[in-house]
């Protein structure tokens, strides 16, 4: 189960980073 949680965590981090880049790109 731990590997599943870590995998989901990585997906969430990637999604948040992509959103942050998109938002920052739009703002700039």
Swiss-Prot record:
<keyword id="KW-0100">Branched-chain amino acid biosynthesis</keyword>
<dbReference type="InterPro" id="IPR012570">
    <property type="entry name" value="Leu_leader"/>
</dbReference>
<keyword id="KW-0432">Leucine biosynthesis</keyword>
<dbReference type="Pfam" id="PF08054">
    <property type="entry name" value="Leu_leader"/>
</dbReference>
<dbReference type="GO" id="GO:0009098">
    <property type="term" value="P:L-leucine biosynthetic process"/>
</dbReference>
<comment type="function">
    <text>Involved in control of the biosynthesis of leucine.</text>
</comment>
<keyword id="KW-0428">Leader peptide</keyword>
<keyword id="KW-0028">Amino-acid biosynthesis</keyword>
<protein>
    <recommendedName>
        <fullName>leu operon leader peptide</fullName>
    </recommendedName>
</protein>
């Amino acid at each position: 189960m731990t590997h599943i949680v870590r995998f989901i965590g990585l997906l969430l981090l990637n999604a948040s980073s992509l959103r942050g880049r998109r938002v920052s790109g739009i703002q700039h």
